[in-house]
Amino acid sequence: MTVFRQENVDDYYDTGEELGSGQFAVVKKCREKSTGLQYAAKFIKKRRTKSSRRGVSREDIEREVSILKEIRHPNVITLHEVYENKTDVILILELVAGGELFDFLAEKESLTEEEATEFLKQILSGVYYLHSLQIAHFDLKPENIMLLDRNVPKPRIKIIDFGLAHKIDFGNEFKNIFGTPEFVAPEIVNYEPLGLEADMWSIGVITYILLSGASPFLGDTKQETLANVSAVNYDFEEEFFRNTSTLAKDFIRRLLVKDPKKRMTIQDSLQHPWIKPKDTQQALSRKASAVNMEKFKKFAARKKWKQSVRLISLCQRLSRSFLSRSNMSVARSDDTLDEEDSFVMKAIIHAINDDNVPGLQHLLGSLSSYDVNQPNKHGTPPLLIAAGCGNIQMLQLLIKRGSRIDVQDKGGSNAIYWASRHGHVDTLKFLNENKCPLDVKDKSGETALHVAARYGHADVVQLLCSFGSNPDFQDKEEETPLHCAAWHGYYSVAKALCEVGCNVNIKNREGETPLLTASARGYHDIVECLAEHGADLNASDKDGHIALHLAVRRCQMEVIKTLLGHGSFVDFQDRHGNTPLHVACKDGSAPIVVALCEASCNLDISNKYGRTPLHLAANNGILDVVRYLCLMGANVEALTSDGKTAEDLAKAEQHEHVAGLLARLRKDTHRGLFIQQLRPTQNLQPRIKLKLFGHSGSGKSTLVESLKCGLLRSFFRRRRPRLSSTNSTRFPPSPLAAKPTVSVSINNLYPGCENVSVRSRSMMFEPGLTKGMLEVFVAPSHHLHCSTDDQSTKAIDIQNAYLNGVGDFSVWEFSGNPVYFCCYDYFAANDPTSIHIIVFSLEEPYEIQLNQVIFWLSFLKSLVPVEEPIAFGGKLKNPLRVVLVATHADIMNIPRPAGGEFGYDKDTSLLKEIRNRFGNDLHVSNKLFVLDAGASGSKDIKVLRNHLQEIRSQIVSGCSPMTHLCEKIISTLPSWRKLNGPNQLMSLQQFVYDVQDQLNPLASEDDLRRIAQQLHSTGEINIMQSETVQDVLLLDPRWLCTNVLGKLLSVETPRALHHYRGRYTMEDIQRLVPDSDVEELLQILDAMDICARDLSSGTMVDIPALIKTDSLQRSWADEEDEVMVYGGVRIVPVEHLTPFPCGIFHKVQVNLCRWIHQQSAEGDADIRLWVSGCRIANRGAELLVLLVNHGQGIEVQVRGLETEKIKCCLLLDSVCSTIETVMATTLPGLLTVKHYLSPQQLREHHEPVMVYQPRDFFRAQTLKESSLTNTMGGYKESFSSITCFGCHDVYSQASLGMDIHASDLSLLTRRKLSRLLDPPDPMGKDWCLLAMNLGLPDMVAKHNVNNRASRDFLPSPVHALLQEWTSYPESTVGILISKLRELGRRDAADFLLKASSVFKINLDGNGQEAYASSCNSGTSYNSISSVVSRRDSHAWTPLYDL
């Protein structure tokens, strides 16, 4: 449902005189306070209920507003704003003050056809615009054709009143009967499908009247008029058309055609010779012909007085009928009165509904003998209708005219009842003051208090009770008003009735109290209120059920908690002897069973059939409930009335799993042991994980060995020999001896990264695709990631170790070789109870040290998803604990005082930089540990040990204590690993089954999930979770992380077929990991995005991480491509221009391989991979995906034939969606954005290529431009050519930059805004002032946290503010940026300029859609496909056929 502005319109506009009114709308002149400009305010009365006939339905109002928002034309009225209050929707419209066109023309002495056509052209122009948008007005008539200003030389026409207008969907048939009889088309009268043609008929009628002063189809009655229309019964009478030209008659004749298909269209009308003469003779003929002004003036006058004359005539006839009533026969009297009363009553009711007091007063003044107490055909007198509408002036008028205050409708309801039903407090006060009876019952026994309670009017209930209304009256079903409130869930009403002292324990005909009713229907707040006001919690209905029974039966958990909290008797038995626990066990609701047992219910009560709750659960085969009852001590040997145990019942119903469980629990000693195993012990968790990250050669392995050394062992420990730099790539040459700014370790990460600066640099110009970062590859063998070192860590080395002076750890050492990085996302940041050590070498220059640390911290940060709801300041509840360690302090001769610690002069600046970037995302220790990793007995190592021990103690104290079952599982795991054979993977469901089957049958799935999480925390197992891998347990992490991945991805593995392209057969994989089930292994590797299986090529497997070749073409040849279109994007991180975490591009390549394998069933698609890119060919379109800018961006370039723009759009969008999905799932904490490449430079193969950033588009939009300047080429490029290859069909359905709805802002973007704007600003430039600027002052009081003690984990007020504000359709990114700038928060505005999407396809052609962003940025494939599917000029090939 569309939400309009909820502010009080009077705060923004001064309302003046009434300009006009209709059945359900009043138009008043108004002035905008801020600008002084005048507008017209149209107050549309809303329909309160769907069944009501008073007011306009919400759907009709929204349709009118939607159409008005869409149209902008000089000859059509313009919508300014829309407000809404409780009763009305207020449209602020352009003020059209010139009056009706026909009134203006009637004042003229003469009028030629040429002059008339000038006005008609304006009408046609407006209708042409509407029809071009597929909008049909359906109510074109003289009253709706106005002049903007009649006092100018050439008045401008405005078409108004779009209440009946519809957007025509040619795919769906539309029929309706509406409009003014004189002007409706035959298809409306005949209830045939309607379209734009209906407006053309109306234009024909208007033209006929304009030229002649006569109406072509007007009859004496409405039925005669409609009959004339249907028969097209008209002619050009000489009296009226003697001076009319032949062309004018031909124009009318072509419009008044019964068959809509043969009727002139708006385009035909504009080209008709009468409107657009083809030669001089036609023009002169038009100028010589004249409008019949005599008749036209009479028509205008007749129209003005027509309604008044009819009313007077009818009123006179009515008066005469009253005077002669006594002289008429009964039958005659009834007939006449029925007919005439129907008319008068309709007029009265219309006046009441329209709040037209003067009109009703005038009407009743003309009907001096009319009895205003007589009811309408539904049995309702006018006074009651007026009471329902709430107009006190109307009531005063009716009472003055003789209405009885105690009049009733045919159902026995009086005015108090009607006013109460509709919630009119002031009306009730008026009626009470005028002695209207208060507690009158209608035919169903209901009073006004009943109906007020049923409709939820708490203020009315309070008022009626204050008048003295009896709150305990019962209707014919013996229900009180409190029953009504409890049934419908109106808490405020129930509270009001309780506070006035009503009897809360009255029962209805079914024996239900209000408490029973509220409990059954789940209204826990009402249950709470009733309990606090003395409701009997154990009152029962006719079946002996108390409230707790009914709540359990309906699974109303909140109600159950409330009843138990107030002391409801948990063991109450109904007439069948069933307690609430019996009901819960029969229905199988485990959470409710748990709640009842925690309330100390009796587990072994038998019902009338001798069955306990355990019998019912076993009989129904509900294993979880049976297990829990047994755990809580239920008697498994209890017998039913016919001598059967629960086990017997389970066997009889063939519930073998339940019977087996009960059989194992026959002996109490066994059950006691099982129960004891599940209880927490005093033992703390024995071990947590210690994870080490760092580049190759940073000293991770050496540091681990040193930490393991005890004092005595450290004296005898021999330092590992340092190999010569000329013989080993693990220890690169000293930076002083080689290039001063080049780090081999950073080269291991990305070729060319030696030039990466820690500060953000411009991405405006980039090196060519065949130069720069890829020049480092002379031959595959020269790539450092192919080097071999027997001492280097393979994949992830895992060992359980005791670190001397610290404690037990599961140590996970992550290799610094980039070939392994594609598997780290599943293991690096999946446990907040781990300690993460980032190790870097002081041998590197400071800039490289900082880059290395930032790289690993960015990796960890990117792996942590956004938590919802976003906390105050965007903080995380459990940030990862990180320790920074700098090694090789001895080699670099870092100064150290005698017996002291190393003193690194850059530690303060490094820590400051790290905290600025990662302080909100990671818990980084305040100290940088500078040490010699091999000196196990040094003070520096000791200080590090103390710090690790302190962190370990904090983490372990927050972990759950161990249970005997967890310890038992740990001792059993080795045998399970051995039994599991070649693969150590197990589903959680299988794990639960095995534990229950072999170790403890009473352990529930929830128990075992907690234990599995604890085992995961200790490093015994690893729980693998992602969108593709869910609840998979890795029983032996070493098997996968060290053995399988270490062998599969290692550069030491034997060469296999196509190894240079990373392409293997199943047999190759089997040879690499001979001890594994290759089929199952590939399934998990495929799910981890390490490989992609190509089923279309037999049993081939792509593993991009193993690709060695870099000799493939990485750009398009410099050839003549005059008929080709080019385009592309670059996906980059938003906040810091750092390399993407390594391994992500391998995953992108895997997903593109998988995508192409799915597309190429017929062999039409092809993909070629190399180290830092891939090339895709797909039926006339080609695509390059490249890792560029030293790993800081992923570039997607597309080219295709000029005639295949749609294919290019689809291909680019699909690949970008694939990449963004990989980013969002693999690195959920990384915010990315798309930059756009210059299509002209791509076409010219010009390097470097211009890169357009979001702020470039926003700046151009602000300047009202639709193109961007390529400063390199010296020319401009249009938005459409940059974003969608110049494809008009796609571009026309898109929103651009500032016009994109703000709800598309991702969670990561919102979290960043929370960090910027949540903290109080000394100058007040924070979220509070932003809320005021956005027109949401109520949010300030609602979310103000200044008075609260702690802000650590309060919800973010900025997030709440954006959620509220983005629910409005006019909330765009551009408005938000402008509001932030007005606030003085340029930092937040600049961030949005960097992070916002540039181009978004709108699914809804009318404008807004249900906004839901599923990616970090960009458009979705589905949206562009939907645009393509609506094109009916070509049959586009689906993407999978491209």
Swiss-Prot record:
Domain Roc, by residue range, is 681-955
Q: Which GO terms describe its biological process?
A: apoptotic process; apoptotic signaling pathway; cellular response to hydroperoxide; cellular response to type II interferon; defense response to tumor cell; extrinsic apoptotic signaling pathway via death domain receptors; intracellular signal transduction; negative regulation of apoptotic process
Residues modified to Phosphoserine:
289, 308, 319, 333, 734, 1115, 1433
Q: Where is the Protein kinase domain?
A: 13-275
InterPro entries noted in UniProt:
Ankyrin_rpt, Ankyrin_rpt-contain_sf, DAPK1_cat, DEATH-like_dom_sf, Death_dom, Kinase-like_dom_sf, P-loop_NTPase, Prot_kinase_dom
The cross-references to Pfam families, in alphabetical order and at most eight, read: Ank, Ank_2, Death, Pkinase
Residues binding ATP, per UniProt:
19-27, 42
Reported tissue expression: High levels in bladder, uterus, vas deferens, lung, liver and kidney.
How is the enzymatic or functional activity of this protein modulated?
Answer: Activated by Ca(2+)/calmodulin. Regulated by a locking mechanism, involving autophosphorylation at Ser-308 and calmodulin binding. In the inactive state, Ser-308 is phosphorylated. Activation involves its dephosphorylation and a release-of-autoinhibition mechanism where binding of calmodulin induces a conformational change that relieves the steric block of the active site by the autoinhibitory domain. Activity is modulated by UNC5B and NTN1. UNC5B activates it by inhibiting the phosphorylation at Ser-308, whereas NTN1 inhibits UNC5B-mediated activation of DAPK1.
Instruction: Quote the catalytic residue positions.
Output: 139
Q: What's the PTM story here? A: Ubiquitinated by the BCR(KLHL20) E3 ubiquitin ligase complex, leading to its degradation by the proteasome.
- Cofactor or coenzyme needed: Mg(2+)
Q: Where is this region: Calmodulin-binding?
A: 267-334
Q: What happens when the gene is disrupted?
A: Mice are protected against cerebral ischemic neuronal death.
Q: Which UniProt keywords apply?
A: ANK repeat, Apoptosis, ATP-binding, Calmodulin-binding, GTP-binding, Kinase, Nucleotide-binding, Phosphoprotein, Repeat, Serine/threonine-protein kinase, Transferase, Translation regulation, Ubl conjugation
Q: Spans of the ANK repeats?
A: 378-407, 411-440, 444-473, 477-506, 510-539, 543-572, 576-605, 609-638, 875-904, 1164-1196
* GO molecular-function term, one example from the UniProt record: calcium/calmodulin-dependent protein kinase activity
Q: Name one GO cellular component term.
A: cytoplasm
- What is the E.C. number? 2.7.11.1
Q: Which intervals of the chain are annotated as region Autoinhibitory domain?
A: 292-301
Described purpose of this protein according to its UniProt entry:
Calcium/calmodulin-dependent serine/threonine kinase involved in multiple cellular signaling pathways that trigger cell survival, apoptosis, and autophagy. Regulates both type I apoptotic and type II autophagic cell deaths signal, depending on the cellular setting. The former is caspase-dependent, while the latter is caspase-independent and is characterized by the accumulation of autophagic vesicles. Phosphorylates PIN1 resulting in inhibition of its catalytic activity, nuclear localization, and cellular function. Phosphorylates TPM1, enhancing stress fiber formation in endothelial cells.
Q: Which family does it belong to?
A: Belongs to the protein kinase superfamily. CAMK Ser/Thr protein kinase family. DAP kinase subfamily.
Q: How does it assemble?
A: Interacts with KLHL20. Interacts (via death domain) with MAPK1 and MAPK3. Interacts with MAP1B (via N-terminus). Interacts with PRKD1 in an oxidative stress-regulated manner. Interacts with PIN1, PDCD6, BECN1, TSC2 and STX1A. Interacts (via kinase domain) with DAPK3 (via kinase domain). Interacts with GRINB. Interacts (via death domain) with UNC5B (via death domain). Interacts with UNC5C (via death domain).
Q: Which PANTHER family match?
A: DEATH-ASSOCIATED PROTEIN KINASE 1, SERINE/THREONINE-PROTEIN KINASE 17
| Written domain comment of the UniProt record | The autoinhibitory domain sterically blocks the substrate peptide-binding site by making both hydrophobic and electrostatic contacts with the kinase core.
State the protein's name.
Death-associated protein kinase 1
Lineage, broadest ranks: Eukaryota, Metazoa, Chordata, Craniata, Vertebrata
